[in-house]
Amino acid sequence: SRGLGDVYKRQMEHTLRQAKECGGLHTLSKDKLHALVRASIEEYIDRVLPDLCEKSARFRYLFNRLCAAVERIMDEVSEELQSSDFEPLAFELAFGADGQLPAITIREENGTARVVGKVDRVDGWLHDGKLYLRVVDYKTGKKSFDLAELRYGLGLQMLLYLFTLKEEGQVLFGGHEIVPAGVLYTPAREPMLRCARDTEPEKIEKALKKELRRSGMVLEDPAVLQAMEHSALESPCYLPIAVKRDGAVTGSLASAEQLGKLSKYVDHILHEITQEVFAGNIDADPYARTPQQSACTYCEFASACHFENGCGSDRMEYIKATKNDEFWQYIDEVNGEGAHENG
């Protein structure tokens, strides 16, 4: 549930903050890290669940299971960051009136719109006077980065925050020139595996690692990839990339030029949405993966909307899978730059 997801995120953020104050994750033993997790959870119980002992046995069981899961997730995040030159620079970074950065502003002739939001974590790597930033979002569900969604103007938040940090983040991060290095969805959940009782522990661990692999898009630069994960160019474990036998790196990669084009595309979509809002266009026009997986599934306005696919003019628009070259060609078309040339 969303409530459990918030607990996961809160404990991870609090533990990472404490670890940073203690000198960084690389200075902590696993026992010390677990002690920080337990201290964070105890503080949460005192503040939010002082009556935990009075809760049902089922609730206490689920909460204790959650606490154990947080320890495992933090072990995994710790291992990732200890094998990386990127370090957490900000947690719960907010854009808006009460945030560390101003709201994202979209100006049109007939008005101004402002976007507010929050980034779970921002990691950075300072190299040759430039600060490479990546935006990290914790996901408690199965959400993953998807080019098809981007093509339909969905799932743009992470990229929007990344590109905004490039323009507005210097004052917050020491005045260095900022280079967008990517966006990552980090699983913040206890993975569930189906396996035989006699499955070897090594195979289980390998399967767990696979379930907890990040999704996203990262800068196609060998130095940056190796800074993100020291073994990225040989045997990546965390990043959404793979290495072929000939040493070529494949996966969810984008060149600096492509990220620039993506920034322009995101800006275009924002202006398009703003114009629609100012024009009063609020038609129900939902997207869907399948009839059972659509924008309507968790919509808070479903009871007022009464959209019914196939009834009258109500038609669900289905998201089609998008290949990498098709995606970049589409981005070029929207940006008015012609066909994308693959090098």
Where do the model's predicted regions map?
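Structural signature of nuclease core domains in nucleic-acid processing machines
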Residues: 1-343
